[in-house]
UniProtKB/Swiss-Prot annotation:
GO molecular function terms listed in the Swiss-Prot or TrEMBL record: DNA binding; DNA-directed RNA polymerase activity; ribonucleoside binding
InterPro entries tied to this protein: DNA-dir_RNA_pol_bsu_external_1, DNA-dir_RNA_pol_su2, DNA-dir_RNAP_su2_dom, DNA-dir_RNAP_su2_hyb_sf, RNA_pol_bsu_bac, RNA_pol_bsu_CS, RNA_pol_bsu_protrusion, RNA_pol_Rpb2_2
Record note on quaternary structure: The RNAP catalytic core consists of 2 alpha, 1 beta, 1 beta' and 1 omega subunit. When a sigma factor is associated with the core the holoenzyme is formed, which can initiate transcription.
Catalytic activity field: RNA(n) + a ribonucleoside 5'-triphosphate = RNA(n+1) + diphosphate
Full protein name: DNA-directed RNA polymerase subunit beta
Pfam family of the protein (one): RNA_pol_Rpb2_2
SUPFAM superfamilies: beta and beta-prime subunits of DNA dependent RNA-polymerase
Gene: rpoB
EC number(s) stated in the UniProt entry for this protein: 2.7.7.6
Superkingdom field: Bacteria
Protein keywords: DNA-directed RNA polymerase, Nucleotidyltransferase, Transcription, Transferase
Length: 1183
């Protein structure tokens, strides 16, 4: 027997075909969300308050500091928040200290700073009752970047950019005349030496002494028109602020605020880390020949002699000396923007490949402390030096698509940035109030206006591009959403501008970002998914784990190191499937490995690391595809994406052929209920589980608190499917931490179960499976194999209008009693009623304009105090094509203290309607290998082809769908699935380490099947065997969310657009089908003049004609000739609005009057025809 039996969760054993033992457990798959939010609450908020404190007034007398904060208890718990359409949030209270410096008085107060949304345990937020996810954003890391570019003459040039987290950009570039320029904040360019002079290097000689002599610098000095620091400062001021009178002081303060003011310029800790790394002498001196000795500044001893070539070993030896500022120089700058002395490290090296022995100076930034978040003059000088070194052939340019240069902004940081915007707006208000208020009676509470803070948080959660409505179609969709990485959003790329290179797979994605899972369409490559083992470090770079190789014994150790993409560039990494002996040494002398972007074969002694698992390359969804290694990547992409669209079925079933990932994905998705502590199950019922904690103290186990786990029963998910949880533990079971207690939707016994295992034959059948169509047995309909439950929510609000309040009532004008049969005495449908489209769910009337009362009405009004009100029917009805059984009704009243209702709403009624949808012709189905199709025919069970033992097969697929698509994984799954079914087992075939051909065939033989996996099939209609033997097996097929019930649509009489009077389009508007210009050509080609005329007039926008046609049909008369279509009138009006006098003439050159229709009768009749409410409809006008 191939493979070994592995336990997945409490209830499921699978035969696993993996050959590589897992050395590392998969991490919690949603920790990217939870950890980031924890960091925000623990450090992010405090850091922000620290950045903004103290706020001082313009005189410096008052100072406001934020000392500490705490989060209170949420007003509503999670469930209540969802029911009430509220936000699940806790009040944020900040301790604020106000110091009045004149008197020395200190006032402390706790100030309420708004409700702060809390993250749920599953990594989501509940905003206005809906679950949302904050998607992590991939952005360029703040740092210094050097790029190579080819100018129009074909010469190689370079440019450089210093990108901060926020603040002004600094760019260097060369021109055709070899002059080096600088741009400050995207303005016009200046010679680079102007900026150097402004920093305090006044004369030409000082600049040459600093940077070393070279022709580029000489050309730049010639171009530079300034002669000293003052002139340079004035020159920069004129460039940045043209039109304003320049003074030296203004210029200094402008330059200071652009680059050296911490409130305006921020590299962030990641920017400082990257800048120090880029400008560090270690990488820049590698393989260079020294033109001067390296001296230890503290002791004065020579560490490395002149003329030495520094290899990696030599550099490692002198690292300590380099970092303790070897060859450092300190410059006292006079008249500069910054008065502090500037320290740099400067080492001369020989220019590579130069016969004349010229030298160039390599300048380092002397390693500023990680707390320095601004750019320093040393950074600017070192970056200029790097630029001149590049021109001399020393140093490397950067690859912007490398993941060492792209980082993640997760929830915590995105929230922090948003909060910072709110606080800085608040800071302005505080300053203004400080100058107005009386210092005697002033309190912190009076100074602080929390509105901008609340607004910025609300705006972020409600309308940011990165705050997305969670896709809850199934557990895998939830999981993938939380692990999604988007390059779009504020501060990111835009779809239109993103080039091929950004979207493409890069070698640095290995183990960090999935190369397969990405959407098809305009977002391809811009939205990605985190790989299964990847994690995010403190700077936001994605790290992936590797097993360390012992450099002495060359054996694999159990030590696991997480490496970022640029750290990995220094090492050689062996693949996870390299053969090892029992001591962990490589068995082959030559090992397949990766070094940077190259896959090569190297000697085993050169290995530094080894992959931890074959599935570390791919994401969670892709790792659920068995035999992924046998599928073409394009089809695997579709397979990974379509699994997320699978509808939760009524009777889910885990796959016979899985990958072992199903259990982990289900557990971490948030759809299952997991144990928060170890304990014993005390009570189980359908809607709650009680677990008594088991606590161990001094080796003795005793009982602790009782944990209560409520289960969600038949709730509506975000995507309109049924969200239901079922217990899978029994009373008395001892459960471990994080063990699954209850299955969620699309789960079975603690494993993800997106579809069903069905018997599939690859054969044609009367051409019904042409073009990927699917032929299905009626058994799957009768036995509810692919039946799903869908819940739709409808709501109706009773508002205050100008003419009086709307009312929810059973008393609706002009409605028959039979239409009210499902309503209770309040006018609301009762639970359990069966409704179809057009039925009233909530009876509601809205007051019409008040008319003058007659004498009789005035008398009645005087007697009864109630006039016969003019109301119109605005009841909530079941929309077209919907219907089902009323599952639940929720009523919210303002009188009963429901403060979550929006302003002007007195009452809100929500009705939930449930539908049981069996599978139909027209529904979309798919397998896990990108093999998708639409059901074309549902065949009676007795007509389906049957196996030799008489069992009819369930589904027939077209064999032509396999060879050209190159997704052979489905065929292997088919055979192994049949074997698993016959043996009564479940199997796991992990990606890139699953069952090979021999395993599949040996399992088939073990199951007693034919060696080739094929069988004779008999035609159910004739009983004759088919000519050839056919591949029949068990495949896991999913029903997708694209169901025909949601798409089928036909218009009767519906709404028209206001301006053109043409029917609206789309199912939501109850619209018509567009008859476009190509369709007009088709009718013209047939000469079908009358058909064409009625399509362009009566059936479209001839307002008079359509009313008269209706009349003629009702009265049985002949239909009159059409009049002028409305769109022609609109065209004339548009031409007239351009000042053109347009007239319409008949054959006798008489003008045809184009009068506007004012026929009241026509307008009224038109209203009667339109029963449906829809956007910008004619009805709104005529009311």
């Amino acid at each position: 027997m191939a493979g070994q039996v592995v336990q997945y969760g409490r209830h499921r054993k699978r035969r696993n075909y993996a050959r590589i033992s897992e050395v590392l457990e998969l991490p919690n798959l949603i920790e990217i969300q939870t950890k980031s939010y924890e960091w925000f609450l623990r450090e992010g908020l405090i850091e922000m308050f620290r950045d903004i404190s103290p706020i001082e007034d313009f005189t410096g007398n008052l100072s406001l500091e934020f000392v500490d904060y705490r989060l209170g208890e949420p007003k509503y718990d999670l469930e209540e928040s969802k029911n009430r359409d509220a936000t699940y949030a806790a009040p944020l209270r900040v301790k604020v200290r106000l110091i009045i410096k004149e008197t020395g008085e200190v006032k402390e107060q706790e100030v309420f700073m708004g409700d702060f949304p809390l993250m749920t345990d599953t990594g989501t937020f509940v905003i206005n009752g809906a679950e949302r996810v904050i998607v992590s954003q991939l952005v360029r890391s703040p740092s210094v970047y050097f790029n190579e570019k080819i100018d129009k003459n074909g010469r190689e040039n370079y440019d450089a950019t210093i990108i901060p987290n926020r603040g002004a950009w600094l760019e260097y570039e060369t021109d055709a005349k070899d002059v080096v320029y600088v741009r400050i904040d995207r303005t016009r360019k200046l010679p680079l030496t102007v900026l150097l002079r402004a920093l305090g290097f006044s004369s030409d000689q000082e600049i040459v002494d600093l940077l070393g002599d070279n022709e580029y610098l000489r050309n730049t000095l010639e171009k530079d028109g300034t002669e000293n620091t003052e002139q340079a400062l004035l020159e920069i001021y004129e460039r940045l602020r043209p039109g304003e009178p320049p003074t030296v002081e203004n210029a200094k303060s402008l330059l200071y605020s652009r680059f050296f003011d911490p409130k305006r310029y921020d590299l962030a800790s990641v920017g400082r880390y990257k800048t120090n790394k880029k400008l560090h002498l270690k990488h820049r001196l590698f393989n260079q020949k020294l033109a001067e000795p390296i001296v230890n500044t503290e002791t004065g001893e020579i560490v490395v002699e002149e003329g030495t070539v520094l290899d990696r070993r030599k550099i490692d030896e002198i690292m300590d000396v380099l970092e303790s500022n070897a060859n450092s120089e300190v410059f006292e700058l006079h008249g500069s923007v910054i008065d502090e002395p500037v320290e740099i490290q400067s080492i001369k090296v020989y220019v590579p490949n130069d016969d004349e022995g010229r030298t160039t100076t390599v300048i380092g930034n002397a390693f500023p402390d990680s707390e320095v978040k601004c750019i320093t003059p040393a950074d600017i000088i070192a970056s200029m030096s790097y630029f001149f070194n590049l021109l001399s052939g020393i140093g490397y340019t950067d690859d912007i698509d490398h993941l060492g240069n792209r980082r993640l902004r997760s929830v915590g940081e995105l929230l922090q940035n948003q909060f910072r915007i709110g606080l800085s707006r608040m800071e302005r208000v505080v300053r203004e109030r400080m100058s107005i208020q009386d210092t005697e009676s002033i309190t912190p509470q009076q100074l602080i206006n929390i509105r901008p803070v609340i607004a910025s948080i609300k705006e972020f959660f409600g309308s940011s591009q990165l705050s997305q409505f969670m896709d809850q179609a199934n557990p895998l969709a939830e999981l993938t959403y939380k692990r999604r990485l988007s390059a779009l959003g504020p501060g990111g790329l835009t779809r239109e501008r993103a080039q091929m290179e950004v979207r493409d797979v890069h070698y640095s994605h290995y183990g960090r970002m999935c190369p397969i899972e990405t959407p098809e369409g305009p977002n391809i490559g811009l939205i990605n998914s985190l790989s299964s083992y990847a994690r995010v470090n403190e700077f936001g770079f994605i790290e992936t784990p590797y097993r360390k190789v012992d450099l002495d014994t060359h054996a694999i150790t159990d030590q696991i190191d997480y490496l970022t993409a640029d750290e990995e560039d220094s090492y050689v990494v062996a693949q996870a499937n390299s053969k090892l002996d029992e001591n962990g040494r490589f068995m082959d002398d030559e090992v397949v490995c990766r070094f940077r972007g190259n896959n090569t074969v190297m000697a085993k002694e050169k290995m530094d690391y080894m992959d931890v698992s074959p599935k570390q390359v791919v994401s969670a969804a892709t790792a659920c595809i068995p035999f992924l290694e046998n599928d073409d990547s394009n089809r695997a992409l579709m397979g990974a994406n379509m699994q997320r669209q699978a509808v939760p079925l009524m009777n889910p079933e885990a796959p016979f052929v899985g990958t072992g990932m199903e259990h982990v994905a289900a557990r971490d998705s948030g759809a299952a209920i997991t144990a928060k502590h170890r304990g014993r199950v005390e009570h189980v019922e359908s809607n709650e589980i009680l677990v008594r904690r088991l606590v161990e103290e001094n080796g003795v186990e005793h009982e602790g608190e009782l944990d209560r786990y409520p289960l969600a029963k038949f709730k509506r998910s975000n995507s309109g499917t049924c969200y239901n949880q079922r217990p899978i533990v029994a009373v008395g079971d001892v459960v471990e931490y994080n063990e699954i207690l209850a299955d969620g939707p699309s789960m079975e016994l603690g494993e993800m179960a997106l579809g069903r295992n069905v018997v599939v034959g690859f054969m044609t059948w009367d051409g019904y499976n042409y073009e990927d169509a699917v032929i299905m047995s009626e058994r799957l309909v009768k036995d509810d194999v692919y039946t799903s439950i869908h819940i739709e929510e409808y709501e109706s609000e009773a508002r205050d209008t100008k003419l009086g309040p709307e009312e929810i009532t059973r008393d609706i004008p002009n409605v028959s009693e039979s239409a009210l049969k499902n309503l209770d005495d309040r006018g609301i449908v009762y639970i359990g009623a069966e409704v179809k489209d057009g039925d009233i769910l909530v009876g509601k009337v809205t007051p019409k304009g008040v008319t003058e009362l007659t004498a009789e009405e005035r008398l009645l009004h005087a007697i009864f105090g109630e006039k016969a009100r003019e109301v119109r029917d605005t009841s909530l009805r079941v929309p077209h094509g919907a219907g089902g059984i009323v599952l639940d009704v929720k009523v919210f009243n303002r009188e009963e203290g429901d403060d979550t209702l929006s302003p002007g709403v007195n009452q809100l009624v929500r009705v939930y309607i449930v539908q049981k949808r069996k599978i139909h012709v027209g529904d979309k189905m798919c397998g896990r290998h990108g093999n998708k199709g639409v059901i074309s025919k549902i065949v009676p069970e007795e007509d389906m082809p049957y196996l030799p033992d008489g069992r009819p097969i369930d589904i027939m697929l077209n064999p032509l769908g396999v060879p050209s698509r190159m997704n052979i994984g489905q065929v292997l799954e088919l055979h192994l699935g049949m074997a698993a079914k016959n043996l009564g087992i479940h199997v796991a075939s992990p990606v890139f380490d699953g069952a090979n051909d021999d395993d599949v065939w040996s399992t088939i033989e073990e199951a007693g099947m034919a060696r080739d996996g094929k069988t004779v099939l008999y035609d159910g209609r004739t009983g004759e065997p088919f000519d050839n033997r056919i591949s029949v097996g068990v495949m896991y097929m999913l029903k997708l969310a694209h169901m025909v019930d949601d798409k089928l649509h036909a218009r009767s009489t519906g709404p028209y657009s206001l301006v053109t009077q043409q029917p609206l389009g789309g199912k939501a508007q109850f619209g018509g089908q567009r008859f476009g210009e190509m369709e007009v050509w088709a009718l013209e080609a047939y000469g079908a003049a009358y058909t064409l005329q009625e399509i362009l007039t009566y059936k479209s926008d001839d307002t008079v004609g359509r009313v008269k046609t209706y009349e003629a049909i009702v009265k049985g008369e002949n239909i009159s000739r059409p009049s002028v279509p409305e769109s022609f009138r609109v065209l004339m009006k548009e031409l007239q609005s351009l000042g053109l006098d347009v007239k319409v003439m008949d054959e006798q050159d008489n003008e045809i009057e184009m009068t506007d229709v004012d026929d009241d009768d026509v307008v009224e009749r038109k209203v009667d025809l339109q029963q449906n409410d829809a956007p910008e409809t004619q009805k709104e006008v005529t009311d």
